[in-house]
Amino acid sequence: MGRPDDGGGDFSGIDPQKLWDLINSMKNKTGYDGNGSAAPQVSSWMGQANRIGLDTSRLSTINKHFSWAQGQLPMLRRRQSLAANQSAEQGDFGQKGMVGAGAGSLGNFPTSEAAAKAGQDDAKKFKDGKISLQDYLKLIQANQSDPDYAKAGATELGQYRLTELLHDSAALDFDHPELGRAALANFVANAMRAGVDFKDRDGREPLSLLSGLVNKAVFPADVLTNLADQCLAPGNTMYSDEVWKALAADPKAATQFVHDNIEYLPEFMKANSEHTGGLVDPYVKDFAAVLEAGMIGGPGADPKLAADNTTKLVTYYSSHDNHTHPEMQQVFADVIVFYGDDVKASLTDPFPVDLGPGHVSVPNSAWEGFIHESMQNPKATAELLAFSKDMANRVADSDPDNPAAQNAAGLIEGTFGFEATKVYQEIKAKDSKDASTWQGIVSSQLSTVLGTGVDIAFDPGAVVKTVSKAAIKDVLNLFTTHIVKISPDQMGDPPSTATWRDDWSEAAHQSYMKNHSLGNPQQYAQIYSDGKPFLTDDGHLVENATPGQQKAYSEWLKDAAVANALDKAFLNRDLGRLGSMTGVH
């Protein structure tokens, strides 16, 4: 009978933990030194049976089975060692379950003990000059993936001899010098994964050795974060670029690094950081990749930690003028897009609630400040304007008959458009030439992304549309001069959406007073607050509301029936406020 096809193909693998449990069970149950082993009992029975002349053949067979089981342990330990090493490597990238290592070939050695002995012996021979540099590098290359060989060999060599090997690694093949470095990198990475520790008394990994290897193999995440922490110091700049590249390729390590250094990073990566002991210009691009991995996460990374990193940096840049590099501002744009649903909730929910772990729950003013920092980069500006246009369209189209959706769409486009306009005004106040360059890049990028020009992206609506396009030479300037009527030095902070939220809640209260079944609040109570009412008799949120009641209230405020009922009252008040702010009546 054939094996049913479970979709797994011909893959055979090992779960290292389960194999370890099996090894311990076999050792304890069939050996003479195991706790609760049956072997001593069987031997005792055989002795007694022999004394009284009973047949002991069956007991002898049991003992043979016990001996056979004990004889399998070295082989099983070898398989478990190979599997555990690969599992640890893959675990840093979020992969779990069975692995292929150890399921088939045992490598060049039948047991872990044999591999370890060979690793130590070969290293000693090299140290004693009994084998040449090239021959030893060939041995390392042949056994670079063997954790038992690597652990014993690296331990015997020590940090300083390994550093010498790094400098001489091209001797493996002078025509292909990178082969030796790659083999040594795998050798050291597997040794460290198997437990070799090179840290000094202060807990620092050796930068001079490992910075030259980390981009040639997969090193443990904690090793990368240790090296990266050291690279924040000005004296270690020479090692940092290779470390930044390796860190960016490991989302788990990058997320932890950003988390551990979140308070210092804005200073480290500020715009003039090269002159203040921080990030140097040639390495900005590679560090930007670290920052993106640390805020967005990826395989193996903790999404809660990544969101927490983002929350802290969004909050920081919403209240500081400590501008960063354009590359970081582009990362911020990517982050805004990645957390787009969180941005939308913050900007448009009539009653924002905590979005929970793995999300960025910040006030709309925080996102506005973060968007403002990102838009210092004109390419990022164009991408964010295109993103906001697409998001607004999707929100509006999702519920075309619901005024709440249309209001949300306007809030999204208005927020991003306002921040872009504010950035333009600030740049123009300092240097009109820079502003023209910024605008030109935005226009070019938008033309590529949207297939149209910046005049449409910044079109404030009917007022601008009354002006002939032929007369529009500087749409942004036209917008700020004829529509907003606020000079750069008077502009201040962006208008908070809290005011419209007050209007929305007040209009909902007025409508609810007329109809207590408006929007069927009970259905939202059933979904979000275990049936507990969330409204007072006059349509306000109950005091000391639970998170579930707050969520129910937020969703009820967006109900189509509620939005349609309050639409007129809300619009009259909201548009009146907007007119007084902008001068458009």
Write out the residue ranges for each language-model feature.
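N-terminal secretion-targeting helices of virulence/extracellular proteins
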Residues: 1-106, 110, 114
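Short, solvent-exposed mixed-charge patches
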Residues: 1-4, 581-585
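Non-catalytic all-alpha helical scaffold/repeat segments
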Residues: 89-584
